[in-house]
Amino acid sequence: MTELQAKDPQVLHTSGASPSPPHIGSPLLARLDSGPFQGSQHSDVSSVVSPIPISLDGLLFPRSCRGPELPDGKTGDQQSLSDVEGAFSGVEATHREGGRNSRAPEKDSRLLDSVLDSLLTPSGTEQSHASPPACEAITSWCLFGPELPEDPRSVPATKGLLSPLMSRPEIKAGDSSGTGAGQKVLPKGLSPPRQLLLPTSGSAHWPGAGVKPSPQPAAGEVEEDSGLETEGSAAPLLKSKPRALEGTGSGGGVAANAASAAPGGVTLVPKEDSRFSAPRVSLEQDSPIAPGRSPLATTVVDFIHVPILPLNHALLAARTRQLLEGDSYDGGATAQGPFAPPRGSPSAPSPPVPCGDFPDCTYPLEGDPKEDVFPLYGDFQTPGLKIKEEEEGADAAVRSPRPYLSAGASSSTFPDFPLAPAPQRAPSSRPGEAAVAGGPSSAAVSPASSSGSALECILYKAEGAPPTQGSFAPLPCKPPAAGSCLLPRDSLPAAPATAAAPAIYQPLGLNGLPQLGYQAAVLKDSLPQVYPPYLNYLRPDSEASQSPQYGFDSLPQKICLICGDEASGCHYGVLTCGSCKVFFKRAMEGQHNYLCAGRNDCIVDKIRRKNCPACRLRKCCQAGMVLGGRKFKKFNKVRVMRTLDGVALPQSVGLPNESQALGQRITFSPNQEIQLVPPLINLLMSIEPDVVYAGHDNTKPDTSSSLLTSLNQLGERQLLSVVKWSKSLPGFRNLHIDDQITLIQYSWMSLMVFGLGWRSYKHVSGQMLYFAPDLILNEQRMKELSFYSLCLTMWQIPQEFVKLQVTHEEFLCMKVLLLLNTIPLEGLRSQSQFEEMRSSYIRELIKAIGLRQKGVVPSSQRFYQLTKLLDSLHDLVKQLHLYCLNTFIQSRTLAVEFPEMMSEVIAAQLPKILAGMVKPLLFHKK
């Protein structure tokens, strides 16, 4: 490009320029139009204007994606503008054909001036112009597509519309602050979803600058500015600015950056190429700007490109949320520029601004937002706006965001889901639902999870999925206006943060059940048409409030505990069928010695109960069947449970008199044989240990070493059972822990041999030694053993039981007294508690005796006989201690195995006991 071409008056349209054919492809060529002001200013212009480099050709003002240029024309409206045009040199009123669209002032002419200043610098003499097809191909501003009108004449002139890309607001001359410079006017003729984002200096396409508002008296000049920056200005000064002829100064009220619009809506702009002004739509209106408004408060919605088609509220909200959460959205980076205050700065309060399909749902931000923190959820406006609370009455004055829309550190609250700790929600198995990452660490939600939030909300309530807890709660399923399924914050139930999480889903009353809440009503109306199968997950309040605890009332009551057949009643203390009842009676009375052909683990059920009588009898004994046991048929279980709740140990030490001892006896009809036992004795029955097996192999021949090893294994298991039983014993836990250990170590052998006597007495009527269901020794097997004399010593106990006909209640009380029958010589640490406990169980033994004896003399004699038996056990157990210690010492020689716990007890305590370092507590003197 030659110097003559650079000095062509058509390069820059100024006052007095003569028309000449334009160069196609040059973006700065003037329109093919001869304005009313034509003079001779060629020399002035040529001294300023410089050629444009070819590298920037087509990029400064790219063509819009439309057809060839449309010729411009003037209308008869210039008559009304003659006075105004005469006052402004270099400025004219541009009108479209037919007067349908009047050219509005360029909203951001300061950007154009900055671009002109930046790019109109000498870059050499070589310059060429792109052809029209080449220019058409380089269109980086076609991203808005059909959103912009294809024909500028199609826009009504009465609207006064200018594209927000090139529009700017009116600013008073005296207001030079950054906040005031960035004010925008909400258009009346265009809803916020149709607005477009205003490019700022931070944009990649606009290397813009700030504004220096100052009046200039020069007319129609294009001159170089000093480039200095006025104090208080929003950004660096613009260069090559067209100055107005009659500037009024700061007090004149005239805008410093652009000419004010005429009262009739007709505004003035500099001449320029029609190709670059065609897609522009004005946003200027006569209404004043809102004070303190954020410059992006009404333009961010345009950036996300919301379609104009009528959409469902839920779909529009989901689409908006999806666009806000996408990676392409930089969290409001476009807000950084000279037209808006920096993010994090406080915004002045402003009235609520309508927001498209969500009217009256925004309010200004209260307080300073956190620096560089963009909300993850809820607010699709800029930091200057937040979702407004729907409140009524006096509460409307207190503006606070909805708890389920807040993205801060405060905990969220949801109507149907109480608060809970913040776990990540597992991926859901519901069809059509994507996994949503919850918790403070999640930065976004996948777009798939954003669609269909209304159905998601309903399915959450129906299926009972736990809510995601974290810095935000589940999103609302509908706009706040109509049919919302969310309640305001005031109606939410307060739940403590430390409370345990309740049931998975809250009960919803349906079909005549308890009253439906607001959320349940929405669910009832919407769910059957959407997802009928999920109605099966709903349950009434009565069912949801029940805890998953199973008492004895909920267990099957008509099943035989032995074979699983239908039970006919409670026989020998156990709920059994008639077949098992007869079998047990015949097996006990006939004294049969059954042997298992297997490993004592045969299956006993309705079909195979007759295959192995040994295992069937073992199972009967394990279930607690006792020959001559009490019949508790049709007994009120509630009364028994209330009796157990009233258990209390008496505090007095003295023995009760006869009336007190016999006062607990209640007589019923003889056919029922039901007696109400004392509460403490009844509790002792409930904590009685289960049957323990020895694990002896009866298929192998009996040897002394194998039998002793099996007895040691049985003793180890019974020792553990004694520890468990003593811990459940009323009053025993009140003793010192050392005293508890000492009492168990001193009495474990007495308890084992006493239990052996009771089992032999009840199961085999004292004819054999019933060590365990899988280890029963008759007299013939005893004689073959090396410890036959020891077996005869132990056999004395069941024989005494048979002689005295000891009852179960008496046995339970005597067993506890055996635990408290031996103490150290120096006494126990909690000696007083020990004596009180022992006296209490002595009284319980007297009560147990009074259940059977009907007089003072028989009861006293019975008490003497039973206590004498307890005293005799000391000498009997001493023989067992001596034999056990000798066998333990010679265990390697005798090939007898001792378990670990039993070995420790034997090595630590048996030498003390045999040396007389313990004190036996006797009822009678020798």
UniProtKB/Swiss-Prot annotation:
GO annotation, cellular component aspect: chromatin; cytoplasm; nucleus; plasma membrane
Cross-link Glycyl lysine isopeptide (Lys-Gly) (interchain with G-Cter in SUMO): residue positions: K7, K388, K524
Linked residues for Glycyl lysine isopeptide (Lys-Gly) (interchain with G-Cter in ubiquitin): K388
Positions of the UniProt region annotated as AF1: 453-539
Modifications made to the protein after synthesis: Phosphorylated on multiple serine sites. Several of these sites are hormone-dependent. Phosphorylation on Ser-294 is highly hormone-dependent and modulates ubiquitination and sumoylation on Lys-388. Phosphorylation on Ser-345 also requires induction by hormone. Basal phosphorylation on Ser-82, Ser-163, Ser-191 and Ser-400 is increased in response to progesterone and can be phosphorylated in vitro by the CDK2-A1 complex. Increased levels of phosphorylation on Ser-400 also in the presence of EGF, heregulin, IGF, PMA and FBS.
PROSITE patterns: NR_LBD, NUCLEAR_REC_DBD_1, NUCLEAR_REC_DBD_2
Domain notes: Composed of three domains: a modulating N-terminal domain, a DNA-binding domain and a C-terminal ligand-binding domain.
Family designation: Belongs to the nuclear hormone receptor family. NR3 subfamily.
Record-given protein name: Progesterone receptor
Source organism of the structure: Mus musculus (Mouse)
